[in-house]
Amino acid sequence: MAKLHFRPYIPNQTVLFPQRIDENIAANDPVRIVNAVIDNLNLESFKKLYKETGRCPYHPKMMLKVIIYAYMNNIYSCRKIEKHLLRDIHYIWLAGNEHPDFITINRFRNRVKEEINNVFTQLIFVLADKGFISLDVECIDGTKIESKANKYTFVWRKTVERNRTRLMDKIRILLEQVDETIAQENSIKDTSVEFTSCRLSDIVDELKEALERQPATKDKEEKKALRKKKKQVRELEGYRDKLIEYDNHLDTLGERNSYSKTDPGATFMRMKEDAMKNGQTKPGYNLQIGTENQFITDFRLFPNPTDTLTLIPFFHSFQYRYNRLPNICVADSGYGSEENYRFMQENGIEAFIKYNYFHKEQRPRYTPNPFHAESLHYNAQEDYYVCPMGQHMNRIGTKRDKTASGYITESARYKAKRCEGCPLRGSCFKARGNRIIEVNHRLNQYKRQARERLLSEEGIKHRGRRCIEPEAVFGQMKYNMAYRRFRHVGEDKVTMDFAFFAIAFNIKKMCAKLIKEGKGLITVAKYLFMGLFITRYNWNIATCCQMHEEKVA
């Protein structure tokens, strides 16, 4: 009978010539692409973030490699990254056997929050140079992501303004009482104007000085009156502190209607993930991204719950980052406003953006309402509409409305002459008097142009691509990579965190495309990222920043 033999097992055996760590890493592992990408990026701007004195810090390239590779593998916790630096051979190789703790990793992320955007921009230039993207087509969409803040830490603008108004009334009443008792002639004569915290502090100081100047007395009634005066001054001090609190709330709110006490950068908005089905608002951010070939080409956070007001600032961000605007923009109906259409037309951007009711118009059974203003016949030369009964509706004026962004829309108003006794009045309209319609001719023109583009062959292609561009990125981000909630407090730190995620997402997507094409990652890494062209890209970045600073100046 043959004797059973096992392979030698000596876990404590020493090796005379230690092997390289990466010998046990697969040739097509994405960690090699991460290493090649970061090695060939220019991180000179990171040096200004460190002090020349003190203990030598960890190399920023090593820290950047470890964090980005962790984000690629759905690891966002600094403590988990620290554990992998001791256990996982991929992290050990990237870190070069260094072992930064979780505090060091977190401090590094916070330290580079101003410079990480340049790293993202350099990566996009690399992707554009190698043909993964062109920066000509921008598919834009947004999603609401919940903040780290607690749920019930809301501060509402209307509540603050209402309570502040009530506080002003209390201050005026109290000052009138104090004026009667102390009779200050210099400071509190006029109580009709609105008080500020500084003015209220001056009044409190003057009242205290007036009380100190009063002679001491042993009379019981006078002592009682003096205690009452001091109580009124203390009450006035409490009102002053409350006024300062309300003013701080309004300063933090800015143009928003709400914010969270534990995350002042977050705004309360309704999320899609509503477990209670009651429309409860939660603190969060409106994340807007631009994609091309499922790569994230730009991103920005907004406090607006809707997407309409985010498009133009997003284009400004794109132009500041790349010193250019895209040639084509693809987006859903949430961005289809007159202001957005006009901006894109003036800047030479071909807009494949839907408007409200576009899908409804494309249904086979759709029949337009014959009494709707858009269905009425319009004579452009003489500027009048014809109602279903054939009478003219002449123009009577122009209505101007101002949007939340300050844009002014103009709507022409047309009025019928004889609606009384009309047999179609019940179907046409139900208000009293003659019918008046309001028509925005400029917006209707933009809608006609958008309809022609969307129904063209190119428009159908872009409409089909839109569903698999930003929507696919959001799906991978939330469900495949478990990035459903921000883990930092403050807009600057949240932006930093998503910048790390966007870099990791793009590298991961690039690796997936290369593997799908059958290319070996180790072979691609040898020629894909050469340090020669990085200087040109950094010059472009510096030029963008310089042009922006000159424009602001």
Question: What kind of region is each of these model predictions?
Answer:
Residues 2, 14, 39-41, 62, ...:
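Intrinsic-disorder/low-complexity peptide segments enriched for small residues
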